[in-house]
């Protein structure tokens, strides 16, 4: 937004300072200001590394995060929206608690976050589906990072086409 644009030059370095003081490793701040709303506010659309004083930007926008003990590769440059939906943290925790001994279907899996939490929560088997081959590849990589390849199955398919097929299975 226009208001945030005016203060980000001061705010982002302070955010990095606070996170580093908390023991977080911060190598850069990647901005995703590539939404049409910015143009309505007279701002240009762009995405890229915010320059931090004395720092070279990372070579890649692919990063690893850990949430609830689960490791994720996240593409902040090209991933859907911000690359990871942070607001779903507690829903992913709930899935982990509910998955014990169950067979789970994760539709629209994206990074595989719900599927991974189900598998780590003790699901017997998890199938993760997304229409995007790129998303499925990222979800598969995240399963590998967490040692879950044997519990999970991945499919690149349109969920609405796949559901009738799955429903017909015994």
Where are these regions (language model features)?
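A short interface-forming secondary-structure element
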Residues: 1-6
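Non-catalytic substrate-recognition/targeting regions of SAM-dependent transferases
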Residues: 9-84
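Rossmann-like S-adenosyl-L-methionine
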Residues: 55-170
């Amino acid at each position: 937004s226009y208001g945030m644009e005016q203060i980000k030059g001061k705010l982002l370095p302070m955010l990095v300072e606070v996170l580093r003081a908390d023991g977080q490793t911060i190598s850069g701040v990647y901005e995703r200001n590539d939404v049409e709303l910015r143009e309505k506010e007279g701002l240009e659309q762009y995405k890229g590394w915010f320059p931090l004083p004395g720092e070279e930007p990372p070579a890649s926008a692919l990063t690893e995060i850990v949430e609830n003990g689960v490791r994720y590769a996240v593409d902040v440059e090209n991933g859907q929206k911000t690359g990871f939906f942070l607001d779903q943290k507690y829903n992913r925790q709930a899935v982990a608690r509910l998955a014990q001994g169950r067979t789970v279907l994760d539709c629209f899996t994206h990074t595989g976050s719900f599927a991974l939490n189900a598998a780590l929560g003790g699901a017997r088997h998890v199938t993760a589906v997304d229409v995007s081959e790129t998303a499925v590849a990222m979800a598969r990589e995240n399963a590998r990072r967490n040692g879950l390849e044997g519990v999970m199955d991945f499919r690149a398919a349109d969920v609405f086409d796949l559901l009738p097929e799955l429903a017909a299975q015994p």
